[in-house]
């Protein structure tokens, strides 16, 4: 079965064909892109539905010996990102159809390069390939941030490029050090060989991995590129970034930490504690910084940073319940942020700006979109029966079960802080019509169907998950096994 | 079987599809009748509906005597508000009313903490949108204040719930074994306990009066119910705190002169009575506390209706602008007298029965005299209201609008119901199935009921010049708001360090690496 590699090949093939089509006949670009992301989504859902029979699954490129070959692994932990991918990619491509009006070929080319990178990062079991896919993701991200050619997006892209490159150096350094210490880049062989190294060496390795990937998942104070980058990019990239790319980077870091070093090492050598404290700091900082923002996208960017804090806290608990809760929140936050960014894009159509004060009175013009906004914001605060409550409950439960009282309290505090700035969005949108009395903005005539569907679908998912969180927890129920127990991961390729 | 609150929530969902006012009214009425029938007929103390959430069992319908009684009064009062507000309630507020009242009723009949928390928050959200007004800036901020303070309480409750769940492993709605402090904090905000009360006068004095009539009846009473169900102390601490509340509420109320602010502060004081009742461990007092809650909804609703009608007909709400109204608005005056005598606990009026019950259950002289003192204060407050609004001849405001028949009918109906209950204790005992061994109309209890009112009547001429009306602002900053503003100032600093300077950002990330390495080196 060659399905997993197709997840990399399909977008890659699309990239090359896009170049040709852009040259010969532009009208095939959209069908091509849609088909390719539809195919990828189908493959992903195939894995999700057949998870009990088909997983864990390893694919051996070129049929070399398992320890020499480049391996691709799909296990239950991978499903966490797959779930987000399956929901988000197709929807964001659909949304982008009308959003991207010029240079379509270039945009979709970059987008597909991004898909190649994320799919590769998630599935690869080889450190060098990991680095390659990491760079593919990063570089296409830089380019996408600059895509709008506005001053602000160019400046943000430059900053992102600089910070990203510096961090990539550390990641590369970590990989090189790992290779020097173990003599292999195969992720299943590294764990046992790393075990012989002195503690301090391993700690320093972890520090490099943390900084290298930390910039990408925007842990404070490495978050600085994110709010700037979010302001000037197409909504499609906003959604993909906060729902998928950031999560992927964090996903990979967790796999490296837990598989390479093992749970015991992390807990005995302060790594878990550091991550926990850092997660709390990141969350509170993100919430506090979001308070002052006038720009909706920047505000949501800070909110993403804060929400990643919850995920970090949950994962650093190191218990199965914690991993499950963190994974749940990763997917759930992707859904909520996706919905809210799509809705924000729709509001922008009428308001013509992302400044909150320019959005006053939008509720009169777009009542349904505004309602989506309110629902999702309440969900983010964790008010039942929306899905945000389920993930907050899971995280709280996990952290108390692990004996961490203070983090649980901080999560409550963080939720409370977040209410403050989410309310200011609601209040701005639901202010009586004052800006639009004389000159109604363009684009009110109506949203196109492809702009309505993504936000509506994700909101529906959010509500359904609120009532039946078991749908999602069932999907990722076995994820902790493949993260916390190194042997499970190793046995996928060798042994067993 | 269906939880009695659900018909209303379904009605709210149905209402979204009908834009006609009459149809929405019809749905609301129908749902209220259905929920009343459900409450009266369903068997008690049995799990009637369950569901599951994650790996927890939710009990969606469990009817106990106290929840049934409170539920009955909740839906009866909603019917009365619908009559009173027939010409006033807007199309959108009917929907929200359904959700608000529906979740207030539903919360009484759930048997587990998750659904309890769910409806607890739903009440807050519905109330937020009830208060919210797109066109009025002040109401937007009051709604913001309301939801922030209530979500704070809700999150505290959630933390308590999860602590308890972690400790005991179940989510059944019983007095918790862990995290009691967080439960109490959350509930204290909901009932507007002294110190957390600021939202009560702010909200109820600023929102449209027909909504104040509605909202005042539910939010804090749900809190009292929660206290009754959740907090169980060995000592009588709650009762003494209740006394403190009863007296403090009066001190807060008596110097104000905005009608609805006075009535709002008096809620705080009356909540104190209920706490005294349910804080004691003996059966009579607890029954009295719940009974007082039921009565309180009636007469406090009537008081708000009175204030609303005065505002509707004269356009003024501050006692400085009012006076000499008794001839112009006789129905309102009558309602005012009945409500005053009821809240003062005057014999043969509505509040008397429950106050007599609470007093019969008291076990300490301090509580008894404290409550009598509070009774004097309450009487004084409302004698002041009656005097300055209806009798005193300083002002002579014109009637600008004649209140519609529906408003007068609402007031008359509720007064009639109150008088009926006051004159027929046996009937009320049958309806609410309470059997206290108390003789309501013995000489001593009538005497102790009359006393406070008489004392107040005597004191009023002496104290008149100290508590006479003065102009005032409705919205003032309080402690919680100052806390919020100081947090925002901190935020500004956080925002300011994001200067956009690339070198600064780069050095932050290198600094993070450095700190990490230092931690490892030094700790290793």
Regions found by a protein language model. Give the residues of each.
Chain B
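Transmembrane helix-loop-helix hairpins at membrane boundaries of multipass inner-membrane proteins
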Residues: 1-6, 10-95, 170-172, 434, ...
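Aromatic-capped, Gly/Pro-kinked transmembrane alpha-helices
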Residues: 416, 427-524
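Hydrophobic membrane-spanning alpha-helices of multi-pass integral membrane proteins
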Residues: 336-341, 406-423, 483-489, 511-512
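Cytosolic juxtamembrane amphipathic/interface segments immediately preceding
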Residues: 56-58, 320, 396-397, 489-500
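Alpha-helical transmembrane segments and their helix-start/interface "positive-inside/aromatic belt" motifs
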Residues: 21-31, 142-147, 151, 327-334, ...
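Hydrophobic transmembrane alpha-helices and their helix-loop junctions in integral membrane proteins
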Residues: 80-116, 125-398, 403
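Short aromatic-rich membrane-water interface segments that cap or initiate transmembrane helices
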Residues: 54-69, 176-180, 360-370, 439-444
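Membrane-helix interface motif
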Residues: 41-50, 163-169, 343-358, 420-437
């Amino acid at each position: 079965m060659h399905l997993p590699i197709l997840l990399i090949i399909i977008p890659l093939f699309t990239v090359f064909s896009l170049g040709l089509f852009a040259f010969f006949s532009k009208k095939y670009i959209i069908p091509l892109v849609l088909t390719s992301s539809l195919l990828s989504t189908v493959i992903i859902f195939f894995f999700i539905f057949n998870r009990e029979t088909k997983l864990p699954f390893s694919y051996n490129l070129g049929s070399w010996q398992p320890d020499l070959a480049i391996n691709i692994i799909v296990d239950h932990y991978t499903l966490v990102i797959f779930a987000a991918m399956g929901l988000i990619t197709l929807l964001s491509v659909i949304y982008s159809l009308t959003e991207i009006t010029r240079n379509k070929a270039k945009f979709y080319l970059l987008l597909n390069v991004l898909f190649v990178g994320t799919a590769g990062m998630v599935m690869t079991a080889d450190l060098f390939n990991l680095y390659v896919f990491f760079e593919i993701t990063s570089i296409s991200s830089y380019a996408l941030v600059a895509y709008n050619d506005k001053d602000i997006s160019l400046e943000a892209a430059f900053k992102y490029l600089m910070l990203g490159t510096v961090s990539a150096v550390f990641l590369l350094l970590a990989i090189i050090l790992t290779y020097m210490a173990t003599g292999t880049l195969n992720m299943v062989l590294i764990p046992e060989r790393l075990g012989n190294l002195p503690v301090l060496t391993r700690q320093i390795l972890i520090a490099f991995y943390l900084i290298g990937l930390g910039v990408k998942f925007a842990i404070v104070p490495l978050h600085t590129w994110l709010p700037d980058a979010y302001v000037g990019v197409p909504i499609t990239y906003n959604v993909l970034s906060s729902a998928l790319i950031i999560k992927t980077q964090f996903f990979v870091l967790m796999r490296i930490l837990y598989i390479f070093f093992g749970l015991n090492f992390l807990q005995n050598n302060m790594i878990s504690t550091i991550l926990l404290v850092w997660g709390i700091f990141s969350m509170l900082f993100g919430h506090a910084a979001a308070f002052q923002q006038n720009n909706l996208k920047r505000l949501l960017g800070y909110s993403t940073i804060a929400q990643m804090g919850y995920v970090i806290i949950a994962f650093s608990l190191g218990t199965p319940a914690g991993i499950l809760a963190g994974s749940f929140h990763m997917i759930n936050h992707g859904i909520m942020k996706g919905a809210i960014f799509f809705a924000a894009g729709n509001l922008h159509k009428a308001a013509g700006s992302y400044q909150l004060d320019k959005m006053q009175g939008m509720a009169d013009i777009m009542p349904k979109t505004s309602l989506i906004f309110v629902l999702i914001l309440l969900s983010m605060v964790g008010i039942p029966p929306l899905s945000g409550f389920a993930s907050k409950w899971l995280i709280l439960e996990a952290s108390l079960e692990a004996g961490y009282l203070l983090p649980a309290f901080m999560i409550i505090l963080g939720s409370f802080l977040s209410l403050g700035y989410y309310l200011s969005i609601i209040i701005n949108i639901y202010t009586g019509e004052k800006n639009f009395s004389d000159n109604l903005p363009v684009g009110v005539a109506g949203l196109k169907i492809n702009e309505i569907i993504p936000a509506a679908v994700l909101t529906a998912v959010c509500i359904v998950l609120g009532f039946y969180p078991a749908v999602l927890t069932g999907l990722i129920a076995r994820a902790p096994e493949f993260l916390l127990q190194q042997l499970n991961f190793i046995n996928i390729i060798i042994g067993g | 079987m269906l939880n009695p609150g659900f018909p209303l929530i379904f009605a709210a969902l149905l209402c979204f599809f009908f834009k006609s006012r009459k149809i929405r009214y019809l749905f609301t009425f129908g749902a209220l009748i259905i929920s009343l029938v459900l409450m009266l007929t369903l068997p008690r103390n049995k799990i009637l509906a369950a569901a599951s959430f994650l790996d927890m069992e939710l009990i969606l319908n469990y009817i106990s005597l106290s929840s049934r009684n409170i539920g009955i009064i909740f839906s009866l009062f909603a019917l009365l508000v619908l009559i009173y507000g027939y010409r006033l309630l807007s199309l959108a507020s009917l929907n929200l009313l359904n959700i608000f009242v529906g979740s207030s009723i539903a919360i009484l009949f759930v048997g587990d903490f998750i659904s309890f928390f769910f409806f607890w928050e739903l009440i807050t959200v519905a109330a937020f949108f009830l208060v919210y007004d797109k066109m009025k800036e002040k109401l937007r901020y009051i709604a913001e204040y309301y939801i922030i303070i209530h979500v704070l309480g809700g999150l505290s409750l959630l933390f308590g719930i999860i602590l308890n769940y972690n400790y005991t492993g179940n989510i059944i709605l019983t007095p918790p074994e862990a995290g009691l402090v967080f439960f109490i904090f959350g509930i204290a905000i909901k009932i507007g306990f002294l110190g957390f009360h600021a939202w009560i006068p702010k909200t109820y004095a600023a929102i449209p009066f027909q909504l104040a009539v509605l909202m005042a009846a539910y939010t804090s009473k749900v809190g009292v119910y929660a206290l009754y169900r959740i907090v169980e102390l060995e000592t009588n601490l709650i009762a003494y705190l209740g006394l403190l509340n009863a007296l403090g509420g009066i001190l807060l109320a008596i110097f104000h002169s905005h009608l609805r602010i006075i009535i709002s502060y008096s809620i705080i004081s009356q909540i104190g009575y209920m706490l005294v009742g349910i804080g004691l461990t003996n059966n009579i007092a607890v029954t009295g506390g719940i009974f007082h809650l039921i009565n309180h909804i009636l007469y406090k609703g009537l008081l708000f209706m009175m204030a609303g009608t005065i505002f509707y007909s004269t356009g003024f709400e501050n006692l400085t602008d009012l006076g000499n109204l008794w001839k112009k608005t006789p129905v309102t005056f009558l309602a005012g007298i009945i409500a005053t005598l009821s809240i003062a606990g005057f014999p043969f009026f509505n509040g008397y029965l429950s106050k007599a019950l609470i007093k019969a259950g008291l076990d300490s002289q301090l509580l008894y005299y404290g409550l009598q003192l509070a009774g004097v204060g309450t009487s004084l407050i409302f004698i002041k209201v009656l005097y300055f609004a209806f009798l005193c001849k300083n002002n002579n405001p014109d009637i600008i609008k004649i209140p519609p028949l529906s408003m007068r009918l609402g007031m008359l109906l509720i007064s009639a119901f109150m008088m009926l209950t006051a004159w027929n204790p046996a009937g009320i005992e049958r309806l609410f199935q309470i059997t206290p061994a108390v003789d309501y109309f013995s000489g001593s209890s009538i005497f102790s009921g009359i006393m406070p009112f008489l004392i107040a009547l005597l004191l009023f001429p002496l104290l008149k010049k100290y508590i006479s009306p003065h102009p005032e602002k409705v919205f003032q900053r309080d402690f919680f708001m100052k806390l919020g503003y100081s947090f925002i100032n901190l935020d500004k600093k956080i925002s300011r360090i994001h200067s956009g300077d690339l070198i600064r950002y780069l050095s932050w990330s290198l600094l993070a690496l450095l700190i990490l390495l230092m931690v490892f080196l030094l700790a290793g």
